[in-house]
């Protein structure tokens, strides 16, 4: 500390008890001290820049940076990253991850920079084995949520009024209901244009393996752009991708088969793999029968596909995934309702019945998915 600042601190701390804390002299001293300290800090940053002292890629503070968790960051940011991952906390930024001062203003943006700017990796952090050093509020929330803490966070940098929430917009997914619905509609349109061999017409396990391999690549691409995926960890993203593959291989194929099954019928012969044939017959007797009854159009199929994916996920995954799943279901259902109101002559009761019928179709999907998993294990398809 320089001599001028030291002397000023001594003068302020040595004020007599009789002096008023609001006196002009005291206030001027404090203002002068604040300006002096601010200039000292600015000068320090300038000197560090001139001397080419490296700055932390997360908080931009010139300091000693070292390898941590597969990346490079300062000790403070590395400790923040370790604590966030080990306690399984998921921060959600309310400002679309555009906070300027990531270190102090928003933990969600700070964690984002830990991953993207500093290259820190979740897999390098060990989970806490004992609750000895875990904060009480974390333990309490873990008991209620199954082990994962999801927190929305945005520290105020300036007193700004909260923006008015947009109608039909998900604050968590950061996307409107119409855009979310369009995402799934685009996936179905791609399947129609792809003109891949229909799964219900194949005969051999090799054909199924080829279709699954192609759909895995398409599902990976879809998951990269799927709203809310950036809020999930690596394992959760793998689960979502698995359900996308299932919906692409079996749900979309069954719907396409129902539209043109007279052109897709295969000849009766003995070249079928027996287990595959049994499962395809099961799909035809359940899902295909339902599609033939309800005659879903492409908009309804897109909504049904989304509902299937996230309803399957909802029952066996993390707290964060359940939150994202509910956001997807609410957004898609709202967009489908808006489609009926805008493009059909259905009244509110008819719309409610139709959406209920589409949602109830998911019941048959649970058993199909379970039997598909057994089939894949039997014939050696990675699952």
From Swiss-Prot:
One of its GO terms (cellular component) is nucleus. It holds the Pfam family zf-C4. Its main location: nucleus. Residues 172-383 form the NR LBD domain. Keywords: DNA-binding, Metal-binding, Nucleus, Receptor, Transcription, Transcription regulation, Zinc, Zinc-finger. It is found in: Nucleus. The keyword Metal-binding applies. One of its GO terms (molecular function) is zinc ion binding. Residues 53-127 bind DNA. Belongs to the nuclear hormone receptor family. Orphan nuclear receptor. This is Nuclear hormone receptor family member nhr-217. It comes from Caenorhabditis elegans. The lineage of its organism: Eukaryota, Metazoa, Ecdysozoa, Nematoda, Chromadorea.
């Amino acid at each position: 500390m320089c001599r001028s600042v030291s002397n000023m601190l001594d003068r302020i701390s040595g004020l007599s008890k009789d002096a008023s804390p609001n006196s002009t002299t005291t206030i001027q001293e404090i203002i002068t001290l604040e300006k002096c300290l601010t200039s000292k800090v600015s000068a320090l940053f300038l000197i560090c820049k001139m001397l080419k002292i490296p700055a932390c890629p997360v908080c931009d503070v010139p300091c000693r940076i070292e390898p941590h968790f597969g990346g490079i960051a300062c000790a403070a940011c590395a400790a923040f990253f370790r604590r966030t991952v080990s306690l399984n906390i998921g921060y959600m930024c309310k400002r679309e991850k555009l906070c300027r001062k990531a270190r102090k203003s928003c933990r969600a943006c700070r964690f984002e920079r830990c991953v993207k700017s500093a290259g820190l990796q979740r897999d390098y952090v060990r989970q806490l084995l004992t609750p000895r050093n875990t904060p009480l509020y974390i333990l309490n929330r873990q008991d209620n949520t199954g082990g994962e803490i999801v927190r929305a966070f945005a520290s105020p940098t300036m007193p700004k009024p909260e923006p008015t929430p947009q109608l039909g917009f998900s604050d968590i997914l950061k996307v409107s209901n119409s855009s979310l619905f369009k995402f799934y509609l685009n996936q179905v349109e791609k399947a129609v244009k792809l003109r891949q061999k229909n799964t219900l017409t194949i005969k051999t396990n090799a054909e199924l393996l080829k279709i699954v391999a192609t759909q895995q690549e398409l599902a990976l691409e879809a998951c990269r752009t799927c709203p809310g995926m950036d809020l999930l960890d690596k394992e959760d993203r793998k689960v979502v991708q698995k359900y996308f593959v299932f919906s692409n291989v079996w749900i979309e194929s069954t719907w396409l088969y129902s539209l043109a099954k007279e052109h897709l019928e295969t000849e009766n012969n003995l070249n079928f793999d027996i287990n595959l044939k049994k499962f395809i017959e099961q799909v035809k007797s359940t899902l295909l029968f339902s599609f033939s009854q309800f005659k879903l159009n492409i908009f309804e199929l897109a909504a049904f596909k989304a509902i299937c994916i996230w309803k399957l996920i909802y029952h066996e995954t993390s707290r964060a995934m359940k939150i994202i799943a509910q956001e997807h279901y609410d957004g898609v259902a709202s967009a489908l309702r808006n489609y009926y109101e805008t493009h059909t002559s259905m009244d509110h009761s008819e719309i409610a019945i139709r959406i209920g019928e589409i949602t109830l179709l998911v019941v048959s999907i649970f058993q199909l998915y379970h039997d598909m998993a057994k089939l894949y294990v039997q014939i050696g398809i990675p699952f």
